[in-house]
Design a protein with these regions (language model features):
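A generic structural signal for short
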Residues: 24, 62, 89-91, 112-113, ...
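Residues that cap or initiate secondary-structure elements
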Residues: 29, 55, 96, 115, ...
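Conserved AMP-binding/adenylate-forming core of the ANL superfamily
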Residues: 45, 49-103, 120-125, 172-175
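Structural core segment of the AMP-binding/adenylate-forming
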Residues: 79-80, 103, 107-175
């Protein structure tokens, strides 16, 4: 049985074509635990993600890798005071860490607010004022940390800041 069959009922016609799908999941369904971690238990070494970039770098991750690294990120967030319902803006461009952060935020029940790396400082400030944010996780590239830090300072400077792959003054490095 596949993990999805735990939460989906399918009906097929005589030619094997899908005719109906019914979702059947509990009220406390959590994608991170119920799908990602379940896959990590059932098929830990199965390839879950193949990542590459325009510079020719490539990385591959198994379900066990994503489960472990998302749990580590979830612990970092929890230790920093991020809790269920807290809002976290994420601008990770095309970094593979996006997947660890996304699953981690699902695990703790935080709300991920996606943010493009192309936003100006004023755009970020607008979002901070519209949606009280407890944290921001961003790429270290393209001057994004400077724009984020500037917007946070203008907004009153109360949220936690993380980046990935590189140490940036004023930000904790999530990796």
């Amino acid at each position: 049985m596949h993990v999805y069959e735990t939460y989906c009922r399918e009906t097929f016609d005589e030619k094997g074509r899908l005719t109906q799908i019914q979702l059947d999941y509990p009220a406390d369904f959590n994608f991170a635990y119920d799908v990602v971690d379940a896959m990590a238990r059932l098929a830990p070494q199965q390839k879950a993600l193949v990542w590459c970039n325009s510079e020719g770098q490539e990385a591959q991750f198994t379900f066990a890798d994503i489960s472990r690294r998302s749990s580590q990120a979830a612990q970092v967030f929890l230790q920093a005071g991020i809790r269920r319902g807290d809002r976290v803006m994420v601008a990770l461009k095309r970094h593979y860490e996006y997947w660890f952060v996304t699953v981690a935020l699902h695990k703790i029940g935080a709300v991920l607010i996606p943010m493009t790396h192309m936003l100006t400082q004023e755009d970020i400030l607008y979002r901070l004022r519209c949606a009280p944010v407890q944290a921001i996780v961003c790429t270290p590239q393209d001057q994004v940390p400077a724009r984020v830090a500037g917007a946070v300072a203008q907004a009153g400077g109360a949220c936690k800041l993380w980046t990935v792959q590189q140490d940036i003054p004023g930000f904790s490095n999530l990796t």
